[in-house]
A protein has these predicted regions:
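Central cavity-lining transmembrane alpha-helices of secondary-active solute carriers
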Residues: 62-83, 283-296
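Conserved MFS/SLC helix-loop-helix module at the cytosolic interface between two early adjacent transmembrane helices
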Residues: 75-109
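Cytoplasmic membrane-interface "Motif A"-like loop-to-helix N-cap segments
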Residues: 85-97, 302-321
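C-terminal ends and interior cores of transmembrane alpha-helices
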Residues: 98-116, 318-340
């Protein structure tokens, strides 16, 4: 895809198209995380409450949460396949956005048919949009352009600006004024994102187009020929790295499920005489990403300048270990609850801080890694597989949350912490062998950094 990029208008050292995708994804994540922030709380709220919910048990709510968040991301596989085979990423993102606006809007209707229909449309919409917009970000950069990782970090900050705002705004509206008002507000956010995406099409002229109609002969040939030995090896590495992804998200997504309920039911949320809404704690992750995103990216860039290990696989392993360490704070919170009958808010804050640093080391890095290693003909499909692995991690999170009803939070939090750290150290033992199979996919970045500095695309305006 990136080979077709000829001339791009730039802003702050990156293609303007990056910021179009930044705001599109920001509003998409505003709608998704806003709805996610109140979904479980809506399910478990008693029907007799002033702001009545469905009155489900914690186990039932977490089971639905697990299935929903899994299917949202598993749908990325057909979404990526449709883009590769028929539509291209650009049109797929458009159709996904339309489905999302419809899905979130229907959730505002207070009927069970609307609830399940809305969830179904959101699943289809995210499947069409999520893998393809990420692939388009990679397509904005020429092969070997060292700005690619930083571009994905900027894009990732956009995701979390949306998540931060939605957890506060949609969370507040849903908990205080009514769950369905919150769902409707999420739909308005997605509509704004869709309008912004359509308005910025002139900056996305060279990315996301269906490769079957490409004028580039090299791209046409790449779409038809079988995979080479190098491409097959790189795909193997990607699939192994996806194991890290499943484990990471299986632990991390306790945020929307078990940790969300824990904040609501077992945490002392009083602050100067005012009770902090439980859904607001989910905004901590996004807030930390906004403030720490560029710092973490700069740290890894500094390591690369110093010639220290800073490969994508190394970053992902370190991210998993850091995130796992954060769960020891939740172990402490559960221990405090068993002793005192409630736990302090600072345990949640510390846990989210470590989870965020871990996420910054693994999630945007994994997105960039896929655009480096995936064969052109399967670019969106491989991105879809990545998000499907995220979905399986989400389902795992739901199962772990359900298990807490019988095993207890202390056991679950401690088990997650220990497993993540040990699994990360185990993969670290095989890191060099796995990186050998990438056949130097990231080597050119270092060479460019040492000899040329940043590769700057043409500034001519199309």
């Amino acid at each position: 895809m990136s080979a077709t990029i000829q001339k791009q208008k730039e802003l702050f050292g990156h293609p303007v198209g990056l910021y179009v995708l930044f705001f599109t994804e920001m509003w998409e994540r505003f709608s998704y995380y806003g709805m996610r922030a109140i979904l479980v709380l809506y399910l478990v709220a008693q029907t007799t409450d002033e702001n009545g919910g469905l009155g489900w048990s914690n186990g039932e709510a977490l089971a639905l949460y697990g299935w929903y968040t899994m299917l949202v991301y598993v749908a990325s596989i057909p979404g990526g396949w449709i883009a590769d085979k028929f539509l291209g990423q650009k049109k797929s993102v458009l159709y996904g956005g339309i489905l999302l606006v419809a899905g979130h809007s229907i959730l505002a209707v207070e009927q069970m048919w609307a609830f399940y229909t809305g969830l179904g449309l959101i699943i289809a919409g995210v499947g069409m949009l999520k893998p393809n917009i990420s692939t388009m970000v990679g397509g904005l950069y020429k092969q070997g352009d060292i700005r690619r990782d930083k571009g994905f970090t900027i894009f990732y900050i956009g995701i979390n600006v949306g998540a931060f705002l939605s957890s506060l705004i949609v969370g507040y509206v849903g908990e205080v004024h009514g769950w369905h008002y919150g769902f409707g507000l999420a739909g308005i956010g997605m509509a704004l994102g869709l309008i912004q995406y359509l308005a910025g099409q002139k900056h996305l002229k060279y990315v996301g187009n269906y490769s079957g109609t490409s004028d580039n002969e090299e791209e046409k040939a790449a779409m038809k020929r079988p995979l080479t030995k190098i491409e097959k090896d790189r795909v193997v590495v990607l699939f192994i790295s996806f194991l890290l992804v499943i484990v990471f998200w299986g632990a991390f997504e306790q945020a929307g499920g078990l940790m969300n309920i824990y904040a609501s039911e077992k945490t002392n949320r009083m602050l100067m005489g005012w009770e902090v809404p439980a859904s607001w704690f989910q905004s901590l992750n996004a807030m930390f990403i906004i403030f720490l995103g560029t710092t973490v990216a700069a740290y890894w860039a500094h390591r690369k300048l110093k010639g220290k290990v800073s490969t994508s696989l190394f970053k992902m392993i370190v991210g998993l270990i850091i995130m796992g360490t954060g769960f020891f704070f939740m172990t402490a919170a559960a221990g405090q609850y068993e002793t005192n009958g409630s736990s302090a808010m600072y345990w949640l804050v510390l846990a989210y801080l470590f989870h965020t640093v871990g996420e910054l080391c693994i999630s945007p890095v994994a997105l960039s890694y896929i655009t480096k290693l995936a064969p052109l003909k399967y670019a969106s499909l491989m991105m879809g597989v990545y998000f499907a692995m995220t979905g399986f991690g989400n389902k795992l999170a739901g199962l772990l949350g359900e298990a807490s009803e019988s095993l207890g939070e202390y056991t679950i939090f401690t088990g997650i912490a220990v497993f993540c750290v040990v699994f990360g150290l185990l993969v670290m033992l095989f890191r060099k062998k796995l990186e050998h199979l990438t056949h130097g996919a990231e080597d050119n970045e270092r060479e460019m950094l040492e000899t040329e500095g940043y590769e700057v695309a043409d500034k001519d305006i199309n």
